[in-house]
Amino acid sequence: MILGTLMNSGKLSHTVAIILKALSLGYQFGFDIMEVTGLPSGTVYPALRRLERDGLVSSSWEAEEQALKEQRPARRYYTLTRQGKEAEGAATKRYPLLTRLIPDKWGKTV
């Protein structure tokens, strides 16, 4: 239902499609998504919140111990839900160049 709403309402924008693709390729942190896509934080984080609200993305905080060990703030992990994976597939069909735009987390472009 949400996927149909996204597709029909035009809310499956380039920005949302790029963020979904980045998540599908293993980028889990907002900063990583910003770095690989070139999108600013004022675009990425509100989009991630909307995607989470709409059930396409889930998030969780990393263990505080890891952040303390690395002397930095804790990061929030974002992952695609089942519906998010469906939306990413639809995004790839709608915007086929996404497959060449973002390298996967391990360095190869798919």
Task: Tell me the role of every PLM-derived stretch.
Residues 1-8, 83-110:
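Amphipathic alpha-helical dimerization/coiled-coil segments
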Residues 6-45, 49:
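N-terminal helix-turn-helix DNA-binding core of bacterial DNA-binding proteins
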Residues 22, 80, 87:
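Conserved SAM-binding loop
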Residues 25-29, 53-54, 84-85:
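Short, charged/polar surface micro-motifs in flexible loops or helix N-caps
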Residues 36, 78-80:
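Short beta-strand element of the conserved SAM-dependent methyltransferase core
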Residues 54-71, 79:
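Beta-hairpin "wing" of winged helix-turn-helix
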Residues 74:
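Exposed loop/turn and edge beta-strand positions of beta-sandwich/beta-sheet ligand-binding modules
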